[in-house]
Each structure stands twice: as structure tokens, then as C-alpha cells.
Amino acid sequence: MREYRTVNLELGLPAVSEMPRRITTEVRAARGQKIKLIKFIHGYGSSGAGGKLRPAVRRELEKLKKLGLVKFYIEGERLSIFDADTRRAMDHCGELRGDADLERHNNGVTIAVL
């Protein structure tokens, strides 16, 4: 059984207003299935200055962290073996060691640790 799942939030070009419900639904479903991590793909934004989806995702994950549904999250730009949270996440879920975005500093993804 996989320890983590990838959720592409960009599919279907969703409205930012849909993100809180969608993220909460994904987190609750993953917790029920004993998934340890969720990799949210939200993109960076087509303007080159960052889009609206990325901050909306991270705001919602911060709320879920305060509610105890998410332990912590790692912004893709910090996803590195030199980052303490990334090492903690790899200890929690070994599959993260093989993730394609590790060391890519991809600010279009965020990892939620459940």
C-alpha cells in the first residue's frame, strides 16, 4: 500500500474558492486510508509572479494544522534533504525519498504530512 498520494489541484482549472473544501476532503479521506503524506500540485501561476492557488492551498493547510488534521507541511521550494522538515517527513514516510520533486525547489507543489 502506498504511503503517500499525489493530488493535482490544477486539473479542471478550479476556482480558488473551491480549495478549502477540496483540500479538507482530500486530507480527511487520506487520513481514513492511513495515507501519511499528500503531495498537492497547485502550480506557481502563469503570470510568473505566483498565482492565487498556491497561497490558498497553503492557507488552508495552515488552518488544518491548527485543527490537528495536518502535522506540518513543506513548501516545494524547501523540499530538500538539507531541510529539517523534509528529513522529518522522510522518516515518517520513506516513499518521499524517491519523489521526483525532491531537490527541485518546485514552488508549484506542497507536501502535507498527516
Predicted regions mapped to residue ranges:
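Long, charged, low-complexity intrinsically disordered regions
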Residues: 1-114
